[in-house]
UniProtKB/Swiss-Prot annotation:
Source species, domain of life: Bacteria
EC identifiers of the protein: 1.13.11.24
Name of the molecule in the record: Putative quercetin 2,3-dioxygenase PA2418
Coiled coil regions in record: none
InterPro entries reported for this sequence: Pirin (IPR012093), Pirin_C_dom (IPR008778), Pirin_N_dom (IPR003829), QDO-related (IPR053186), RmlC-like_jellyroll (IPR014710), RmlC_Cupin_sf (IPR011051)
Cofactor(s) it depends on: a divalent metal cation
Cofactor note: Binds 1 divalent metal cation.
Organism in which the protein naturally occurs: Pseudomonas aeruginosa (strain ATCC 15692 / DSM 22644 / CIP 104116 / JCM 14847 / LMG 12228 / 1C / PRS 101 / PAO1)
Residues that coordinate or bind a divalent metal cation: H61, H63, H105, E107
EC class name: oxidoreductase
Keywords, comma-separated and alphabetical: Dioxygenase, Metal-binding, Oxidoreductase
UniProt pathway: Flavonoid metabolism; quercetin degradation
Amino acid sequence: MKKVLGIYGNANRHWVGDGFPVRSLFSYNTLGQHISPFLLLDYAGPADFPPAQQRRGVGQHPHRGFETVTIVYQGEVEHHDSTGAGGRIGPGDVQWMTAASGILHEEYHSERFRSTGGTLEMVQLWVNLPSSDKMNPPRYQTLLDADIPRVGLPDRAGELRVIAGRYGRHQGPALTHSPLAVWDVQLKAGKHLALDLPKGHTCAVVVLRGTLAVGDEIVREAQVALLDRDDPRLELEANNDVQLLVLSGEPLDEPIIGYGPFVMSSREEIDQAIEDFENGRFIRAH
């Protein structure tokens, strides 16, 4: 059975723009290679917004060298980027953006959500790219709720959505650059779930709502449990109804050099990213 190496969380929220009050639950700045290929996870909300005249969100900003994965639980957001791609995602939908060689993008509450108001709840996960893929062309994947496999758990314990990777016979729709899994799980109170994950892969369990026993440890709302890579068996038991994410992936074992919105493999590549951005060499819409 997997052992918990550490439990991490953050009670303090900070604003990303004027639309996303987030708690950063983990980051490569503190966990480094231990969390690879994942870089960070921000949990936004749940937060209530009244109807508004002006749009809320975060304006155009750059990224290079990694991917952002946005999972919406409540509310609705719109995304536009410098490749001309974009879209609107609502409850259950996922936006998987590969910044790679460089992209400029903006994220706002949708016009519909802005005008009606409501509760916003979402996760944004950063996933590192192998150094060989960091300068690939950007890519945007819209994964609608209807296209994400839903699997009923044994003993009517709940439901697992396969966003990326494989669970049993079910393959998630996300195209990834390295072997990894992102599973969105609802586990009912008092129920148990056992998962077998690849030996040697990083494993983290993110609790968004509820309280969960992970092995011998209790993990609470807005906390992340980092587990060992040696034992493939992950044992979970819900103390009450729990919403959680299971993140698993093959470690990249490459240098992680980050500076704000850029994550590369060397300081020289960071300097080049800054120079390219400042000189308008990121992809721009025609």
